[in-house]
């Protein structure tokens, strides 16, 4: 028994139909008024952008949950139509303000891009991968698969029918 791996069911799905945000969701700092809404579009979490970024250690727009296992599969669907080149949206694998990985959608000119960036302690933020999303229609599913300390990242532009490999990190 001792040599067998032990697993806890940490499966979690949130369809955002409750009037209140589930307590499994967390914020980096104390949530400010009008940070998010569950009422604007029932069944969806609406996150409002803030002018701050992760690096400046101020309150930025982030709602997340803690990673509880080293082996997991994670998917999140995001609806986002960038209209302003100064705003981006996506997911973040966050350890601290000085150590994180982002996968975000943004607009540059008339093109839409998915870019993955890595920030490590005492290092500058670097772009790992940048992909032009020619078939982006305002909806994307981000997928992360973690096995034995290796993270593999995918995305889908067809509601999860097909996933495209983005990158891997260990």
Regions found by a protein language model. Give the residues of each.
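Extracellular glycan-recognition regions
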Residues: 1-170
């Amino acid at each position: 028994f001792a040599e067998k791996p032990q697993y806890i069911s940490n499966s979690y799905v949130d369809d955002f139909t409750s009037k209140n945000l589930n307590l499994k969701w967390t914020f980096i700092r104390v949530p400010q008024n009008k940070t998010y809404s569950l009422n604007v579009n029932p069944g969806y979490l609406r996150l409002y952008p803030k002018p701050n970024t992760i690096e400046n250690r101020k309150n930025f727009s982030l709602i997340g949950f803690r990673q509880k296992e080293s082996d997991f599969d994670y998917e999140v669907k995001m609806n986002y139509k960038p209209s302003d080149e100064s705003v981006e949206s996506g997911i973040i694998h966050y350890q601290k303000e000085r150590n994180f990985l982002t996968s975000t959608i943004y607009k540059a000119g008339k093109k839409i891009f998915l870019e993955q960036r890595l920030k490590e302690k005492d290092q500058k933020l670097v772009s790992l991968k940048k992909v032009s999303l020619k078939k982006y229609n305002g909806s994307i599913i981000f997928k992360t698969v973690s096995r034995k300390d290796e993270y593999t990242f995918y995305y889908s532009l067809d509601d999860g029918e097909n996933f495209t490999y983005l990158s891997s990190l260990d």
